[in-house]
Amino acid sequence: MILLAVLFLCFFSSYSASVKGHTTGLSLNNERLYKLTYSTEVFLDGGKGKLKDSVGYRISSDVDVVLLWRNPDGDDDQLIQVTITAVNVENVNQQRGEKSIFKGKTTPKIIGKDNLEALQRPVLLHLVRGKVKEFYSYENEPVGIENLKRGLASLFQMQLSSGTTNEVDISGDCKVTYQAQQDKVVKTKALDTCKIERSGFTTVNQVLGVSSKATSVTTYKIEDSFVTAVHAEETRDFSLNFLQAIAGKIVSKQKLELKTTEAGPRMVPGKQVAGVIKALDSKYTAIPIVGQVLQSACQGCPSLAEHWQSIRKHLEPENLSNAKAVSSFLAFIQHLRTARREEILQILKAEKKEVLPQLVDAVTSAQTPDSLEAILDFLDFKSDSSIVLQERFLYACGFASHPDEELLRALLSKFKGSFASNDIRETVMIIIGALVRKLCQNEGCKLKAVVEAKKLILGGLEKPEKKEDTTMYLLALKNALLPEGIPLLLKYAEAGEGPVSHLATTVLQRYDVSFITDEVKKTLNRIYHQNRKIHEKTVRTTAAAVILKSNPSYMDVKNILLSIGELPKEMNKYMLTFVRDILNFEMPSSKMIRRVLKEMVAHNYDRFSKSGSSSAYTGYIERSPHAASTYSLDMLYSGSGILRRSNLNVFQYLGKAGLHGSQVVIEAQGLESLIAATPDEGEENLDSYAGMSAILFDVQLRPVTFFNGYSDLMSKMLSASGDPVSVVKGLILLIDHSQDIQLQSGLKANMEIQGGLAIDISGSMEFSLWYRESKTRVKNRVAVVIDSAVTVDSSFVKAGLESRAETEAGLEFISTVQFSQYPFLVCMQMDRAEAPFRQFETKYERLSTGRGYVSRRRKESLVSGYELPLHQENSEMCNMVFPPQPESDNSGGWF
């Protein structure tokens, strides 16, 4: 009895998990003609758009299906013929009316006579247990037409029982899940698992990346082992991570309904399907059911030279602060990606020097084999006449959105050659480090060129050929962030000379917290507490910063807090404000600091009431539920009131992902003799020096020097013009996402998102002995444009959505120090300039014959300028440096 019950349960389970009457796939009746109607339609709109506002089109037809052959040895081995007839193309938006691009057009005019004939030629499907074993069509049919037939054919592939499996259809080799109910089957395709060859790339950094979501659900209604209705819907949503105004949605629907059945032809006799097909028509050939690449030809497009001439004026130096310059830059990159080496080289050789740097930016950013060959042929690294162009090329390589091994190999080859400028040689190595990191982030750490570059960087630090090369290799490691380089960094940080020691600690500062182990913190503690040797305060404060931001232990925090009060005055004040900043901004280590501060020995008035002008402050530029922009400003002075280091950082966060947008560090040393002041401990023998270093979008750039040595300082003070020194200037391709999508309906979708900016970061340091005042300025000016283009193409009609967001913005930091008294007066100001924000949206439908419909929208707003807040002490100091002017008395009179 128990055995019978178990057998019954097993039978009932298998029955309820499959459609009544069959256990595998669809089955056609002998000598019956199934007449169906079929439509595929596509909607395209912004991320939150409504279907009634969409652009798109519908292709509808009748479909005849007939069973041609069934294997005598098994019902689940069938050959069926599918024929499309009565094709029609129309709008999905019925409100288009007189504006419809199809109005007054016949189907042959819309599709093309040859295309229509090909579309209506029948295809054969060899179905085995419900799955397409072979797809037969005629050779040399247009790819777009074949894909439409593949999209229809894929609907006949299904199984009548529940379960998860892998299937090959027009979307590729995909994981699918079936849920079978009474007379109904629901198929869910996991589109993110589909394996299909398609071109595309994206930006590695998640903050600058694109999020997408894809779903596919097909519902079958079954009667007598054949479909009475099929409804399939595929959606593709995307948005730019940090600016969700750049978004879009594609909805693709397919509908197949059985209308009637009638008497059909007799089946073709035969034991093998190959013989049956040959008897039917020897011109039939087996082709993949996986969608093939549809190449979209550009009709009437200008040549590369014509395009360059049309945008050239927008890329002249005086126009680079405008958004139009960036949009022209992005459009030209797209054209360069289809250009040949000879075309590119011809334009480079013909251009004048004023616009050449911008042209070099564009050619390098194109990142194609032809563009790389052209720019390498054009630049001569042995010549000092094109140093600006060489530098622009190298920085564009560093900012490359999707670098490949070939680019790294090219730079390694250049590094082994000779250079007219040592600065360029150093820049090559620094950028090699940036490329190593990007390739490793994209699972390319084991590439031959990457392995070679890593050996070169680490070998240069282990045994540098020249002592001055140490800085170069440290800067390369600051970009590469190789975990195996940490022991070398610790060696240089603890035992190196002042500037080298400081640079090594700043490199450690860029590593992820997970790499700052207890062993690393032991060394950093020795540096901060000067257990083995005296260190400059720039080195000590950086070491403390790394410790306090890397999950410090109770004793790490306690020892640092106990040191406050015993340090040189300005370092004392800096460490005090740094700890307060961690607490105020609720950084991860704030909980541990609060725990230690409960001890009276660590938390007392004498320790935390020291005066000084140095400071550290962090604040928000913008904040939203899913993202945040922060800025931080650190100022460290010598005891005599002269700036030692200013450090301005901007970070962009998206969830747990972060992007180091920019860092501008101005450093000075050895200037005490100018005002007859006493240097701080450990800094008695420093040479006079001032310079600036920058990180831009996670890439460390080569530092620039204002002056080096006392004689250089005096000559520049006497001849100073007050003009700022440029750290980086140029056009950068920041966001770069390209994706070809095979829709299951047979249509081709393409998504392109590019974001670029024109940037100018400059800095200056003014020093007046007469007024006993110094002033430091850092200016950031940017124009930003983000372009998005999404298209759905059938080869004879195309729908598209184009979006653009643009702005021009500026951020200026000014630090004024008056050292005529002690404590000296320091005023820091951070001003964000007024910025316009413009958004554009264009939707269109266009026939291959040229007729089109276009809809445009525009929105513009103005973001007010404001001064970014710093700490209260700074506000009070600024009122003393720049006292409010008394109101003038306009009452008239002689006196």
Curated annotation (Swiss-Prot):
Which Gene Ontology BP terms does the record give? cholesterol homeostasis; lipoprotein metabolic process; phospholipid transport; plasma lipoprotein particle assembly; protein secretion; triglyceride transport
- What residue range is the signal peptide? 1-18
Q: Which residues form the Vitellogenin domain?
A: 28-659
Quick one: where is this thing mainly located? endoplasmic reticulum
Its Gene Ontology molecular function terms?
Answer: ceramide 1-phosphate transfer activity; cholesterol transfer activity; lipid binding; phosphatidylcholine transfer activity; phosphatidylethanolamine transfer activity; phospholipid transfer activity; protein heterodimerization activity; triglyceride transfer activity
Gene3D superfamilies according to UniProt:
Lipovitellin, beta-sheet shell regions, chain A (2.30.230.10), Vitellinogen, superhelical (1.25.10.20)
Q: How does it assemble?
A: Heterodimer; heterodimerizes with the protein disulfide isomerase (P4HB/PDI). Interacts with APOB. Interacts with PRAP1.
What job does this protein perform?
Catalyzes the transport of triglyceride, cholesteryl ester, and phospholipid between phospholipid surfaces. Required for the assembly and secretion of plasma lipoproteins that contain apolipoprotein B. May be involved in regulating cholesteryl ester biosynthesis in cells that produce lipoproteins.
Instruction: Write down what this protein is called.
Output: Microsomal triglyceride transfer protein large subunit
